[in-house]
Amino acid sequence: MTLRPSLLPLRLLLLLLLLLRGAVCQAEAGSETESPVRTLQVETLVEPPEPCAEPATFGDTLHIHYSGSLVDGRIFDTSLTRDPLVIELGQKQVIPGLEQSLLDMCVGEKRRVIIPSHLAYGKRGFPPSIPADAELHFDVELIALIRANYWQKLVKGILPLVGMAMVPALLGLIGYHLYRKASSPKISKNKLKEEKRNKSKKK
């Protein structure tokens, strides 16, 4: 059986379209699997050993063990070979994504965290261990938690506001002093000399 000459171009075109569609589908599937995460992802690996009455919140001091790795599995930092890391939540002592993942965590709990680059080191990276735009993976365990009391939280919350309020006041005082200095009448040198002469004559 032979194909009509008029049907050959049509069948070749259909075959090319099918091949092209398959290639596009494979490319889309590959891009979906390789695309970086856009939001913080938190997975609980180990639940706290007992009901958690005091989950971590801003102002608390946390003792954590962690291991940080890149997408390819290379570990760039770990605390497992040293003492736990001590941080105070809300003081920006670690990258934003890691700090956010520690909120509501309980002692004894272990989490796996996937942090997008904009919540880690962003475009600048942290050479040489962390490249630019790197997605980071952390395994974190909360070893101990020291609860901040009411007065500690109050002081830490008010002091920044007081500092912000004092800046305009100080600027206003400086501006007022400069204005008074500029608007005060200036005495010429000749007039000063005359006043000195008059004082000396009176003596």
Curated annotation (Swiss-Prot):
Going by the UniProt record, its keywords in alphabetical order are: Isomerase, Membrane, Rotamase, Signal, Transmembrane, Transmembrane helix
State where it is primarily located.
membrane
Give start and end of each PPIase FKBP-type domain. Answer: 59-146
This entry carries the following GO cellular component terms, namely: endoplasmic reticulum; membrane
Organism the protein comes from: Bos taurus (Bovine)
Q: How does it assemble?
A: Interacts with IFITM5.
* PANTHER family attached to this UniProt entry: PEPTIDYL-PROLYL CIS-TRANS ISOMERASE FKBP11 (PTHR45779:SF2), PEPTIDYLPROLYL ISOMERASE (PTHR45779)
Query: According to the entry, what is the taxonomic lineage of the organism?
Result: Eukaryota, Metazoa, Chordata, Craniata, Vertebrata
Q: Which Gene3D superfamilies does the entry link to?
A: 3.10.50.40
Q: Which PROSITE patterns does the annotation name?
A: FKBP_PPIASE
Q: What does this protein do?
A: PPIases accelerate the folding of proteins during protein synthesis.
Spell out the protein name for this chain.
Peptidyl-prolyl cis-trans isomerase FKBP11
Reported EC number(s) for this entry are 5.2.1.8
Ranges that cross the membrane: 158-178
**Where is this chain's protein located in or outside the cell?**
Membrane
Question: What family does this chain come from, according to its entry?
Answer: Belongs to the FKBP-type PPIase family.
Does the keyword section mention Chloroplast? no
Query: Biological process GO terms, please?
Result: chaperone-mediated protein folding
**Region forming the signal peptide:** 1-29
The reactions it catalyses are: [protein]-peptidylproline (omega=180) = [protein]-peptidylproline (omega=0)
State the annotated membrane topology for this chain: Single-pass membrane protein
- Enzyme class, broadest EC rank: isomerase
